[in-house]
Amino acid sequence: MFLREVARRFSLIARFPAGAARKWHAVCCIGGKKLPLLFRAPAIHLKLRKMRFKITPDFSISTALLQFHIEEVPGLSEAQLRSAPGAVSLRLPPGLNYGLRERQEWLNRCVVEELRRQCRLVLAPRVQAWAKRGGVSFNRLTFKDVSSRWGSCSSLRNVNFNVWLLLLDEPLVDYVVCHELAHLTHLNHSAHFYAEVDRIMGILGEAVRRDRELNRVSRSLAALGRYR
C-alpha cells in the first residue's frame, strides 16, 4: 500500500492480486488518527477528463437511450427545460452570447444535471432489470459526472455509473451494467469475474468481446468532450 497526495487530499492505494478476498477489514493510521479502509473493485476506465463541450444551438445528443437538443425560441425571456424519459429539449432565448466562459460553464452544468436525471429515469430501471435477471442485489445506486471510469462497485455493495454512459450504444451500456453487477460477486478482474459477467449476460465469451469494443469506443470518445 502507498499514499499519494492529489490537490492536498490523500488517498490510500491498495493493490491486490487477481482472486484476492473481496472483504477486507483494515485500519490506516495517518497523523495519529485511525482511518477505516474501504476496498473497492477495479473500475472500467474511461481515460478522459470530465466531458465538457462547446455548447451552441447546434449541440445535440442522439443515441438509442437519449435524444437531447437545444432550441432557440423567439420571445422567450429565460431558459426552459422540457424533459421526458429519453427526450430532453433545452429551450433558450435567441441571441445569447455562447462565447462567454460563464455561459458555457452554466450550459455544461445544465447538460450534466439533466444527464443525471435521465440516468435515474432510463438507466436505473435497466440496472434493476439486469440485477434481477442475474440474481444479484446491491445496496445503493448512484450516477456521477466522473472522468476516469464508466462505472464502479464497492465492497459495501454500492454501484456507481458515469452519467455519460448515455452516450454509448445499448449493448455497451448493458455490458457496463453487467460488469459492475459482476463485481458484487468478484471484486477483481479474474477469469471467474469474466465468467460471472457472461453468466449475467447469458452469452459465453460476451464479456471479453464487449470489453474490447468498449475500449475502442472510449478511445474514440477521447477526441470529444475536451472543451474548456
What is each stretch, according to the model?
Residues 1-20, 24-174, 184-228:
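Active-site-proximal or metal-binding-adjacent scaffold patches in catalytic folds
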Residues 180:
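Walker B catalytic acidic pair
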Residues 177:
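Walker B beta-strand of ABC/ABC-like P-loop ATPase nucleotide-binding domains
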